[in-house]
Regions:
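Extended helical coiled-coil dimerization/tether regions that scaffold
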Residues: 69-139, 146-176
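General N-terminal leader/first-domain-start detector
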Residues: 5-6, 16, 42-43, 106-110
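Switch/communication elements of ASCE P-loop NTPase nucleotide-binding domains
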Residues: 1-7, 16-27, 132-246
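Generic solvent-exposed, charged/amphipathic alpha-helical segments
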Residues: 26, 91-99, 103, 195, ...
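RecA-like P-loop NTPase motor core
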Residues: 203, 222-329
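ABC ATPase nucleotide-binding domain signature region
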Residues: 23-85
């Protein structure tokens, strides 16, 4: 908060507290009044717009499917979706964004009062499979599409300098946008595209609005870093004794931020300390996969020496229990 920068971009592994950080920052900027429900009060009073796991909690499936009930994604009453859907009518824009990142055949249908969403899949020849339950990844993409529509409108309104000239006063008190990991299930092409589009939105902001973006994806981080023309970054390290070090880095993030080097260092340290554990094999496999992808090999096992290939491949496959090339560690 004290840094007073337009954009702060943060990378951290899963499980290190990015979502907790978003919550703590929200409480710092706008402490919740006693008895107030999260994101349920008047939108005009908000100082921070945030996307995180807590945002996704506003959407939940109606699991009461007795009597052949149709699966619906319910939306808890809140000021953000009420404004973007009921007052601004952005449902078609949301549907278009969602289809862009998933499939043009997968269509969301809002109820007239915007309290529920159902989904259908177009199979061609005018055949439709109605009322399907989408995957968790598709659900996350849908929720991001809702947030994206709100973010576009927020930036557009605040770019109007004179508050009296804005079409709404709903965002006049807004100071921060906190975005936590909007990349849960995108392939690399769409991941890059989302990062480029988000960077473009951020750069289009001409007001005093400040942005904080956190992610566990090295690719998403690097694309944003480069698109936002960042010049300086900081590496926060935690030591075994509980101490911390914050080191300033300059230049290309690919030189300052090297996930594969961190994996290599972690594995080498475990070997040196004679403390190799099961998860180190998962790290090793992850390192092989990233190297194979960079060198253009279809299978990471092709990197292994011929006399060790079969043995090591079996060992790593057995210990990591995964054939996924994009596994998050």
């Amino acid at each position: 908060r004290a840094a007073n920068k337009k954009v702060q971009l943060i990378y951290a592994f899963n499980g290190t507290g990015k979502t907790r950080l978003s919550r703590e920052f929200k409480e710092l900027i706008a402490p919740k009044a006693e008895g107030e429900e999260a994101q349920a009060s008047d939108l005009a009073a908000k100082k921070i717009l945030y996307y995180s796991a807590f945002t996704e909690d506003l959407f939940y499936w109606d699991n009461d499917l007795g009597l052949d009930a149709e699966p619906k994604l319910r939306i808890q009453p809140n000021s953000f979706t009420k404004w973007v859907l009921e007052e601004q009518g952005k449902d078609q824009s949301i549907a278009a964004t969602f289809q862009h990142y998933t499939s043009e055949k997968l269509t969301p249908h809002f109820s007239p009062d915007f309290s529920t969403v159902s989904f259908s899949f177009e199979r061609g020849n005018n055949q439709q499979e109605p009322h399907i339950k989408i995957s968790k990844g598709e659900e996350s993409n849908f929720i991001w599409s809702v947030f994206n529509a709100l973010l576009e409108q927020l930036i557009s309104e605040l770019n109007i300098v004179e508050a009296d000239s804005r079409s709404t006063d709903a965002f006049n008190n807004m100071e921060y946008v906190f975005i936590d990991d909007p990349v849960s299930s995108l392939d690399e092409n769409h991941l890059i595209e989302l990062a480029v589009n988000l960077a473009g939105l951020i750069k289009s902001s001409q007001s005093d609005l400040k942005f904080i973006v956190t992610t566990h994806s090295p690719l998403f981080y690097n694309v944003l870093f480069n698109e936002l023309n960042s010049k300086v970054c900081y590496l926060l390290e935690r030591f075994d004794d509980g101490g911390f070090a914050l080191t300033e880095k300059h230049g290309d993030s690919n030189k300052s931020f090297s996930y594969h080097l961190h994996l290599k260092q972690t594995i080498e340290q475990a070997i040196a300390d004679n403390k190799v554990e099961r998860f180190h094999f998962t790290l090793l496999r992850n390192l092989y996969e990233k190297t194979a992808s960079f060198l253009g090999h279809p299978k990471w096992a092709e990197l292994l020496p011929d006399d060790k290939q079969l043995y090591l491949a079996r060992i790593i496959n057995f210990t990591s229990h995964s054939t996924l090339s994009n596994e998050a560690v």
